[in-house]
Regions:
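Secondary-structure transition/capping residues
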Residues: 75, 139-140, 184-187, 209
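A structural signal for alpha-helix termini and helix-coil/disorder junctions
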Residues: 42-43, 66-70, 134, 179-186
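Nucleic-acid nuclease catalytic cores
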Residues: 84-184, 193, 199-202
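Metal-dependent nuclease catalytic cores that hydrolyze phosphodiester bonds in DNA/RNA
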Residues: 1-106, 118-119
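Short alpha-helical "patches" and their helix-cap loops
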Residues: 44-58, 144-155, 210
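Iron-sulfur (Fe-S) cluster-binding segments and ferredoxin-like electron-carrier domains
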Residues: 37-43, 200-210
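Residue-level signal for secondary-structure boundary elements
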Residues: 37, 49, 181-188
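Short cysteine clusters
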Residues: 32, 189, 195-205
Length: 210
């Protein structure tokens, strides 16, 4: 068998999840656990999307400049890439927040959003807040403590204090990862809105709506 055929998924050596996938499930914005579970265990071809990142990139640059003017040491995008290996579950969780800013003992993680506010945005930043101090790549930057979180929208800034990374949030994440790492395969939960952007091709999901 070869994995060069179009749309044929390649099994991952280890379950692998992006923070954004987990955030959507935690926020209840994605109902098809099957799709996320398949992506965690297999590599699928990326679907091309008509997304113009120029507005987002410009806002990141401007925000970073503002923080630097306020005396922060600012780390942007690729400098913030991290991977956290699970201890209880065999999974690697990866992420890349837009900005991590440090001023003395004050550490802030920020994510820039150009669209409308979503519940998953808060979950995404909270996951960054939890995982950044645990990752080898960013542990030192975070000074071994949970950073303050911010979501930067065009018209407002949403503050997420460190105390929100509480026992309940950690339990919810732990329960979700336990579900995703189980050997049980979930049934697809198709909908036009989710299937439109889903990476799972119809060859591997007979219930795709589009």
């Amino acid at each position: 068998m070869t994995y060069q055929k179009a749309n044929l998924p390649k099994p991952r050596k280890q379950p692998y999840a992006w923070v954004t996938w987990l955030a959507q499930l935690l926020a209840g914005e994605k109902n098809c656990t099957y799709a996320i579970q398949q992506q965690i265990h297999h590599q699928f071809e990326r679907k091309s999307r008509d997304y113009d990142a120029s507005e987002h990139d410009e806002k990141v640059i401007k925000r970073a400049a503002k923080l630097q003017a306020e005396g922060f040491t600012v780390y942007v995008e690729n400098a913030n890439s991290f991977k956290v290996q699970g201890k209880k579950f065999n999974i690697c969780v990866a992420g890349r927040p837009d900005i991590v800013a440090v001023k003395n003992d004050w550490v802030v993680v920020e994510d820039i959003k150009t669209g409308k506010p979503k519940s998953s945005h808060e979950m995404q930043v909270k996951l960054y807040m939890l995982l950044l101090p645990l990752a080898p790549e960013t542990q030192q930057t975070c000074q071994d403590k949970v950073p303050h979180g911010r979501i930067i929208y065009s018209g407002e800034i949403v503050e997420i204090p460190a105390w929100k990374i509480d026992r309940n949030f950690k339990r919810r994440l732990r329960d979700l990862i336990a579900i995703l790492c189980t050997s049980k395969t979930f049934k697809p939960c198709p909908s036009v809105s989710e299937c439109r952007y889903c990476r799972i091709p119809s060859q591997h999901c007979s219930q795709r709506k589009i």
